[in-house]
């Protein structure tokens, strides 16, 4: 089913195809349905299905999923005599891994914020970055238990910057939602760089961080640069919600992180 939206004569025409299937089943009968999706094309969905679900064997994929989750969850081992507390810990760890999510077909193709199809070559593209919520704890955790994924996440940020002119704030499947405040891709990038994680282009990362921090017409950044804080009683074209104190704190922290990255790279003139 093709649910792609089409832009025609300045109007967005969405097919928004939905389907419902009714089956006449008998009591105890089981149905096995294999599905696939793609953010790129119908053909991409077919390739994803062929690559990821070549057999109609539910138990096989259930076992593979369980093995994969155990592999990731076992990266932290705890000693605890209380089973309930152990269940709580690993349930919380599981929840921490539900996002960010891979956003690409099996061949690396994905739909970018510039409305074009791109291909991640040698890395995995990620999306669903709720950065205002996750930069404080989740992403630092990933640097210890999922460093390879952190490298791919930073590369995803930099690709987003190349395609959209700024780092993501709260990107979701090829688009920017602009939910919440700050530009918290920055501390995620800087944390990875200072810990020596990955092979991403650190110079490009610094460029992206500085460019994002200098979007004067975005959510009071120009006012913040002018005054050293975001005034509570002044708005700009993108500052209607104000939140002056929160923005000042978030911008100050992100800018501190940029300074640490510049220091690490020997860039004293940033």
Residue ranges and their predicted role:
Residues 1-125, 159, 166-169, 198-214:
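Acidic/polar, glycine-enriched structural segments that form the non-catalytic walls/loops
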Residues 91-104, 127-150, 190-196, 256-266:
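Alpha-helical support elements that line or immediately flank enzyme active sites
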Residues 51-58, 74-80, 127, 138-143, ...:
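Second-shell loop/turn segments in exported
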Residues 87-101, 105, 162, 175-180, ...:
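Active-site acid/base region of carbohydrate-active enzymes
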Residues 14, 79-82, 124-128, 135-140, ...:
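A conserved hydrophobic secondary-structure block that centers on an alpha-helix together
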Residues 84-85, 124-133, 177-185, 247-251:
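Secondary-structure capping and boundary motifs in well-ordered enzyme cores
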Residues 64, 68, 84-91, 136, ...:
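Extracytoplasmic/secreted proteins, especially bacterial periplasmic and envelope-associated proteins
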């Amino acid at each position: 089913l093709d649910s792609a939206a089409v832009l025609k004569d300045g109007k967005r025409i969405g097919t928004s195809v939905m389907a419902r299937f009714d089956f006449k089943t008998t009591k105890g009968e089981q149905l096995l349905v294999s599905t696939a999706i793609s953010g790129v094309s119908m053909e991409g969905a077919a390739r994803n299905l062929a690559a990821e679900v070549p057999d109609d064997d539910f138990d096989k994929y259930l076992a593979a999923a369980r093995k994969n989750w155990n592999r990731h969850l076992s990266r932290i081992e705890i000693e605890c005599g209380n089973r309930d507390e152990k269940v709580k810990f690993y349930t919380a760890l599981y929840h921490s891994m539900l996002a960010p999510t891979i956003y690409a077909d099996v061949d690396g193709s994905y739909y970018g914020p510039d409305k074009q199809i791109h291909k991640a070559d040698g890395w995995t593209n990620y999306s669903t970055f709720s950065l205002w919520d996750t930069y404080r704890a989740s992403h630092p955790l990933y640097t210890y238990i999922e460093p390879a994924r952190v490298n791919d996440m930073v590369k995803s940020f930099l690709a987003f910057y190349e395609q959209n002119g700024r780092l993501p704030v709260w990107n979701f499947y090829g688009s920017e939602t602009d939910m919440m405040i700050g530009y918290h891709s920055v501390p995620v990038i800087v944390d990875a760089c200072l810990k020596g994680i990955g092979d991403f282009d650190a110079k490009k990362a610094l460029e992206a961080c500085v460019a994002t921090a200098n979007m004067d017409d975005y959510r009071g950044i120009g006012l913040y640069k002018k005054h050293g804080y975001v005034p509570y009683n002044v708005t700009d074209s993108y500052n209607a919600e104000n939140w002056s104190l929160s923005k000042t704190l978030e911008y100050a922290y992100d800018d501190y992180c940029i300074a640490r990255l510049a220091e690490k790279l020997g860039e004293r003139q940033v």
